[in-house]
Regions:
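Conserved donor NDP-sugar-binding/catalytic core segment of glycosyltransferases
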Residues: 105-138, 212, 216
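Cell-envelope/extracellular polymer assembly enzymes that use nucleotide-activated donors
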Residues: 11-14, 42, 193
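Glycine-rich, basic loop-to-helix element that forms the pyrophosphate-binding segment
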Residues: 72-88, 109, 160, 167
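Membrane-embedded multi-pass helical conduit in multi-pass membrane proteins
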Residues: 256-337
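Catalytic donor/gating beta->alpha subdomain of glycosyltransferases that bind UDP-sugars
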Residues: 184-246
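Short aromatic/hydrophobic "clamp" motif used to bind/position activated sugar donors
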Residues: 93
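A conserved acidic beta->alpha catalytic loop
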Residues: 32, 39, 47-56, 74, ...
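N-proximal low-complexity "stem/linker" segments adjacent to membrane-targeting elements
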Residues: 1-35
Length: 361
């Protein structure tokens, strides 16, 4: 039996989904939106110069959703979201990645939160793994959200005022759009730069714990490694706009990478020297990694109840930290130390200046 519709007082949402060569994903996303307990929203699917367009797929949902399809030349995701913002009619503009599935009470939870916090102009929500995801997808999801990795830093805690949402699950009020001018860069940390600038304008942001989306991320470890390495490079790009934003905690994955790389020579040195104290030192050097690895295994097992996911989760977490650490380190050396290249990909669009004394969020 379908869940009865919930009515919200005076709030209309515009859902904006940038899309590039992923017609199957948009079908699943739109299908999940048809089951929402709150249906007072429009959907804008913006095809970003795809070779495999999803026009027919989107059209098939016109009798179940207030949905519009747009095709434009390729500008990548940041400016594609701006394209959607410019055409949205809602009071709130919600951005999802095309590889997300939306639980049926998503807008119900968001609407209730916004009713209780009318001063909030920006929000984000966490992500989780859907039961239908593959073991690799579940392991990747666990690695990205675990307290034992950078997930504990990125968004495992509720913050009211200064939370920095990510664009796979983010909402902004019309006021926030008008004040900020949208995305300044189109890729390589565009969502973090946007979130930081919104807060710098004095707008209040919040994490809504109940506003969960099921985020597929990547389907194999090779794709995941490339994606996370790019995240590390993007952090250096953000430094260009917010010089103080690259903090010691962002270097933790790089330190993890250096630690792992040092274990090999340390182990070989212990074998060559064949000294009791050296051997003991070598064994102790491995203890932190072994403890962390085992803790991740049992954390994943307790959370998912799946042995295969538990075996894959430490591998995913190790890949996440080493790839991010390498991306950050290599980009920092190339851009900041050696000055061999610009960190920006594409154009930087003009946006309204940040006031010198903005109101505190």
């Amino acid at each position: 039996m379908p869940r009865p519709q919930v009515l919200l007082s005076g709030v209309r949402f515009s859902v904006i989904v940038p899309l590039f060569n992923r017609p199957d994903e948009i079908r699943e996303l739109l299908e999940s939106l048809t089951a929402q307990t709150v249906q007072d929203f429009e959907v804008l699917v913006v095809e970003d110069g795809s070779d495999r367009d999803a026009r027919d797929i989107v059209s098939a949902f016109e009798d179940r959703l207030d949905v519009q399809y747009f095709w434009k030349e390729n500008e990548r995701q940041g400016f594609t979201r701006n394209f959607g913002f410019e055409r949205a009619k809602g009071d709130w503009m919600v951005v999802f990645d095309s590889d997300c599935l939306i639980p049926e009470r998503y807008f119900e939870h968001v609407g209730e939160f916004l009713d209780q916090h009318p001063d909030v102009d920006v929000y984000g929500g966490p992500d989780a793994a859907h039961p239908s995801f593959t073991p690799i997808q579940k392991a990747i999801s666990h690695a990205m959200t675990s307290f034992l990795t950078t997930g504990g830093i990125r968004g495992g805690q509720q913050q009211l005022g200064t939370y920095q949402p990510r664009s796979f699950n983010m909402g902004i009020s019309r006021k926030a759009w008008e004040v900020s001018g949208g995305y300044r860069i189109t890729v390589k940390g565009e969502d973090i730069e946007f979130s930081m600038r919104l807060i710098a304008h004095g707008l209040k942001s919040a994490l809504i714990p109940e506003a969960v989306v099921y985020h597929k991320r990547r389907t194999d470890f090779r794709q995941f490694q490339k994606q996370v390495e790019f995240f590390g490079r993007a952090r250096v790009n953000i430094r260009r706009f917010f010089p103080g934003s690259l903090r010691p905690m962002h270097w933790m994955p790089t330190m993890f990478l250096i630690y792992l790389l040092a274990l090999g020579p340390f182990y070989v040195g212990g074998l060559v020297l064949d000294n009791g104290w050296v051997t003991f030192g070598v064994r102790m050097a491995f203890v932190p990694f072994v403890v962390w690895y085992v803790a991740l295994f049992f954390e994943a097992l307790l959370k998912t109840g799946e042995w295969r996911v538990a075996f894959l989760a430490p591998r995913a977490a190790s890949m996440q930290l080493t790839a991010y650490g390498w991306g950050l380190l290599s980009e920092y050396v190339a851009v900041v130390v050696l000055r061999r290249r610009d960190s920006i990909i594409g154009e930087v669009r003009p946006v309204p200046p940040i006031p010198s004394n903005p109101p505190r969020p």
